[in-house]
């Protein structure tokens, strides 16, 4: 079973449609690799992280 985990700043997912679109797109991408028969077994987890706990280049985003 493919398991795909995405972590991003939580503000990216304020609109619930954003997470739905990302989940669908990642599932479709995995199916191009594993085949359509894998679709029922592909898990996608989208995790929003507060900007204060997300760092880039050694510094928190907030």
Question: Where would I find each of the regions flagged by the language model?
Answer:
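A domain-level signal for the structural core that forms small-molecule/cofactor-binding pockets
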Residues: 1-62
